[in-house]
Curated annotation (Swiss-Prot):
Gene3D superfamilies: 1.10.10.200, 3.30.70.980. This is Probable transcriptional regulatory protein RHA1_ro06891. GO terms for cellular component: cytosol. It comes from the Bacteria. InterPro entries: Integrase-like_N, TACO1_YebC-like_2nd/3rd_dom, TACO1_YebC_N, Transcrip_reg_TACO1-like, Transcrip_reg_TACO1-like_dom3, YebC-like. One of its GO terms (biological process) is regulation of DNA-templated transcription. It is found in: Cytoplasm.
Amino acid sequence: MSGHSKWATTKHKKAVIDAKRGKAFAKLIKNIEVAARTGGGDPAGNPTLYDAIQKAKKTSVPNDNIERARKRGAGEEAGGADWQTIMYEGYGPNGVAVLIECLTDNRNRAAGEVRTAMTRNGGNMADPGSVSYLFTRKGVVTLEKGDQSEDDVLMAVLDAGAEEVTDLGDTFEIVSEPTDLVAVRSALQEAGIDYDSAEADFRASVEVPVDADGARKVFKLVDALEESDDVQNVYTNVDLSDEVLAELDD
């Protein structure tokens, strides 16, 4: 199992806890609003909106909240903000690369909060391009294992452009090119396999191994960044060995 998959496992466990917070709901709602504004308010003709709604439903966001966000984004209802996507780059403890994806209606506030979180938790901001080249944009679909084997999932998505299927313990993760994401998700649906989320993600092409102490410091930094309402996603190139994961679970 590669380092990013272990990181994904840890992030998944954390996401289950985070899903209980209103902050996580707000970020999912924001994704729906932006997707509707960018590609139209009909999920049938807007795959990004469809997937944003699917993820929100799987995370138990109330249907009324989802529908209001869709309407705001589509211009059917007043109150939508002018959200902008901004990427920040930096280095965390142990030289770990950090890519921070913000969705904000106030660039100055977002920049200030990101900088504060970085400097207070052993990180440093970096110039644009100094970290992003270490990451590649990928399509990622996650699903609960259920009754499916890894081979079942692989057979369903192989011809749709899936590059790999990874067993993450309680879930499977399917990675593809971003352009094949809808095809992979559709292949699962045609095979009658339910999925949790389908979205574009950043994956590290070069990873940095850390010990348990280093991992805790990186998690602390990521937590601080994700406390900002403007931060949608935080990506790192940390590599967690099985030994480090076992120590973290103790």
